[in-house]
Swiss-Prot record:
Belongs to the major facilitator superfamily. Pfam families: MFS_1 (PF07690). Glycosyltransferase; part of the gene cluster that mediates the biosynthesis of mannosylerythritol lipids (MELs), surface-active substances that enhance the availability of water-insoluble substrates. MMF1 is directly involved in the secretiopn of MALs. Induction: Expression is induced when cells are grown in cultures containing vegetable oil as the carbon source. It comes from Pseudozyma antarctica (strain T-34) (Yeast). This is MFS-type efflux pump MMF1. MELs not only have high potential as eco-friendly biosurfactants due to their excellent surface activity, but also have attracted considerable recent interest because of thei runique properties, including self-assembly, anti-tumor and cell differentiation induction activities, and moisturizing and hair-repairing properties. It is found in: Cell membrane. PANTHER family: DRUG TRANSPORTER, PUTATIVE (AFU_ORTHOLOGUE AFUA_3G08530)-RELATED (PTHR23501:SF102), MAJOR FACILITATOR SUPERFAMILY (PTHR23501). GO terms for cellular component: plasma membrane. GO terms for molecular function: transmembrane transporter activity. Its main location: membrane. Keywords: Cell membrane, Glycoprotein, Membrane, Transmembrane, Transmembrane helix, Transport. It is a multi-pass membrane protein.
Length: 542
């Protein structure tokens, strides 16, 4: 055998590893798959009206095309955290990538909204694994100090995806929307080959029973069902059914009760859960708990804004999907360099608290300005407000994981990192569904008295979001009325994020600015050439 494992200390701490060509090959593959998952979270936003218009009419609300991706993406992340211990990093990440690519094929070949929603669900299942495992594997290979750089680069991937995804969505919506999904196949194939050939990480040996316990089947089943129920409620509420309808509040109540039951199963010792995916001690540490909260809030704000801004430009400024993506550049462009700069500063200084303060301050100021957008907002105003918000969003991308991992023991690496990925994506669920629901609910409420004129033109409760691209074709008198309603509703949706940004800033006072040591904290080790075959205790290769 030409590749063997290096011996690790009992506490899972090892010196910084040499960054040879194999490390960079693995890192490139992880960046590719992270790019795919991030791309499909946001590319659909600008293309959604065109996709819905191209498919046969359906009673399924358009925002289910988004929600169907987010639901399994959120719920699968803790599952893949457990799988990474039971099946190993390699088998788990390859499985996630294959599932994602299969979902992409289903979406690309869909001839109805129903099939597209199913395909998006399969995509989301794989995307959740990709999101969690890329960060777990990078934590296996880097020290806490240098992790800021590499997570800054991964954050850079998410920022770049947020930057170009709306553009690609706009381009494909005008030519052939299935290419939004076909484009994943060649990129995913390259990453798959690299991972199969070069990713060889050993994890501590587990017995068959321990592997099953690591999966936490009961806890994950409760979590999946609870998230599903909540998402059904927030997706249908105010759009397909009134909030007072039992078909909305019953699943909402059941889902919230289920989330409480999930935490009870996870945190109270018992036979149902021997190896919780969300162990209580992750949140018993104040610094880790605050960092998880901030990760969640960042996900709410970032993904909510990136979905609503293109809708504003399409509906109010008469932009095409492609043009609306270009006009969103001031929001996404600052995120790209600032995510990397923030990661570099953390690696140089070993500190993160001041950067977190700066990130939240910029985000709160920028988001607060967005709430003033109206029909008459000038180019300078919408550009500068996006730049400020985007700067804060970019700074926050790489800097909430280091305090989590620095404050928790090494044996919690997989659970801590999967919970981090879950927190951001769960935030995305609430950000996207919350913002679009507020927008659609407020717009529909104000437009109902005029549905007699609008419904024959295709605008009703079910088409409020999809109709954004078509407002410019309305008769002038109706266009003025509807644009005013849409602008007010979009402003209402932005107000969701203002108190959350303020909470994020205030919670930073509770963080401890822990030092980030320059050693690797992980019980899993990348095989290195030249090591003796018996250099370590028997472990499973995956």
């Amino acid at each position: 055998m030409d590749d063997k494992i290096a011996l690790t200390s009992n506490d899972g701490e090892r010196p910084r590893m040499k960054k040879d060509w194999r490390f960079w090959t693995i890192f490139a593959a992880l960046m590719l798959i992270a790019f795919l998952a991030a791309l499909d979270m946001t590319m659909i936003s600008t293309a959604l009206p065109a996709i819905v218009a191209a498919l046969p009419p359906s009673s399924i609300a358009a925002n289910w095309i988004t929600s169907a991706f987010l639901l399994p993406m959120v719920a699968s992340q803790p599952i893949f955290g457990g799988l990474s211990c039971s099946l190993g990093r390699k088998n788990s990440v390859i499985s996630a990538l294959v599932i994602f690519l299969v979902g992409s094929i289903v979406c690309a070949t869909a001839k109805s909204v129903l099939v597209l929603v199913v395909g998006r669900g399969v995509q989301g299942l794989g995307g959740g694994g990709i999101h969690a495992l890329s960060e777990i594997i990078m934590s296996d290979l880097t020290t806490l100090r240098e992790r800021g750089v590499y997570f800054g680069l991964i954050a850079l991937v998410f920022a770049v995806a947020g930057f170009i995804a709306p553009v690609l969505g706009g381009v494909f919506s005008h030519s052939s929307w299935p290419w939004i999904f076909w484009i994943n196949l060649p990129i995913g194939a390259v990453a798959l080959v690299l991972l199969v050939l070069f990713l060889n990480i050993r994890v501590p040996l587990l017995t068959g029973r321990q592997k099953w316990e690591k999966l936490d089947l009961v806890g994950n089943a409760i979590l999946f069902g609870s998230v599903t129920a909540v998402l059904i409620a927030v997706t249908e509420g105010g759009i397909k059914y009134r909030w007072s309808d039992a078909r909305v509040w019953v699943p909402l109540v059941v889902g919230l009760i289920g989330l409480v039951a999930f935490l009870m199963v996870e945190w109270i010792p018992g036979p149902l859960c021997r190896q919780p995916v969300f162990p209580r001690d992750l949140f018993a540490n104040r610094t880790a708990a605050v960092a998880y909260l901030q990760t969640f809030l960042h996900g709410v704000i970032f993904y909510g804004i990136i979905y609503m801004v293109p809708i504003y430009f399409q509906a109010i400024k008469d932009r095409t999907p492609l043009q609306s993506a270009i006009w969103s550049f001031p929001l996404t462009a600052p995120s790209t360099p600032l995510a990397l700069i923030a990661g570099l500063l953390i690696s140089i200084s070993g500190r993160y608290k001041k950067l977190i303060f700066i990130g939240w301050a910029l985000m709160a100021g920028g988001v607060g300005w967005l709430t003033h957008w109206s029909v008459g907002t000038s180019k300078a105003e919408w550009a500068i407000s996006q730049i400020i918000a985007g700067a804060g969003i970019g700074i926050m991308f790489p800097i909430t994981l280091p305090p989590i991992q620095a404050s928790l023991p090494v044996e919690r690496l997989e659970a801590a990192t999967a919970a981090y990925a879950f927190s951001r994506t769960f935030g995305a669920v609430w950000g996207i569904t919350g913002a679009t629901t507020i927008f659609a609910t407020q717009a529909a409420k104000k437009l109902r008295p005029d549905y007699g004129q609008l419904e024959p033109l295709g605008l009703n409760d079910f088409t409020v979001i999809a109709f954004a691209e078509s407002l410019r074709y309305l008769p002038e008198q109706l266009q003025v009325l509807v644009k005013k309603v849409y602008a007010d509703a979009i402003s209402d949706s932005f107000w969701l994020f203002v108190p959350l940004a303020i909470i994020g800033f205030a919670s930073t006072f509770l963080l401890k600015d822990l030092p980030l040591p320059d050693f690797i904290k992980s019980q899993a080790v990348l095989e290195e050439k030249g090591a003796s075959e018996n250099a370590s205790p028997p472990e499973s290769l995956a």
